[in-house]
Amino acid sequence: MEFVVTLLVTFFAGMGAGLGTGFAGMSAAAVISPMLITFLGMEPYMAVGIALSSDVLASAVSAYTYGKNKNLDIRNGLIMMASVLAFTVVGSYAASLVPSTTMGGFSVFMTFLLGVRFIVRPVMTTKEAMAGVSAKKRAVQSVVCGVLIGFICGFIGAGGGMMMLLILTSVLGYELKTAVGTSVFIMTFTALTGAVSHFAIGGKPDATVFALCVLFTLVWARVAAVFANKASPKTLNRATGVVLVILGVVIMLFNVLT
């Protein structure tokens, strides 16, 4: 019976996380961690480690799918990733100096708001409009935005994927598919760094839960990424919006229940 419960929890956690990753470049930690903590009574630190591990492969397979469909800006993605990683460390150091408050609710609320935004005001930027920005300007923007995202993620400890999607579409004027593709590409490496450090500090995870979460998240992320790359911009905006709103509401309910 215990295995059935584990199977169901990891299946739905992986499904939510995978769809969020494949459609919107959302971090799996936002979905998987609260479910493992609530239903399987797992240690929060371990749950986050498993969620980040699930993120690595799911983000990698999504990035590969987006890249294959020419919806990935690797050059600026690498520039942004360098500043995100560097300033995540600065952000977490700054967070250790101030009184600790849980800011997890902030990222959940942001997920919900971002979902509403995609439904109400779809991102209809085209690749042609993106090409109009000079390479130098885009590189500078990538560094500045990476610093901002990294610092906030390190300080709050969450919301990286959503923050990136928001900034790529709103500030940098990316077309939605390229924004998600670039976001999951960066997240593959940030999640890997996080997962390795979690297990280095916290020890080995529960092998069954770990394997199931990674597998289910990977499968659903692949499904979502394939659909996202075939869909028209309007359909994709709606689908992304709906997925984010549902996930936002579900996670908020979890937080209330626990």
Ranges and model annotations:
Residues 1-19, 33-39, 44, 65-151, ...:
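Juxtamembrane transmembrane-helix boundary motif
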Residues 1-6, 10, 53-64, 158-168:
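Hydrophobic, membrane-facing alpha-helical anchors
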Residues 18, 48-56, 180-191, 244:
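Transmembrane helix-bundle signature of multi-pass membrane transporters/permeases
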Residues 42-50, 75-76, 173-184:
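Membrane-interface alpha-helices at helix entry/exit sites of multi-pass transporters
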Residues 126-127, 158-163, 174-178:
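Short, structured loop/turn "capping" segments at alpha-beta junctions
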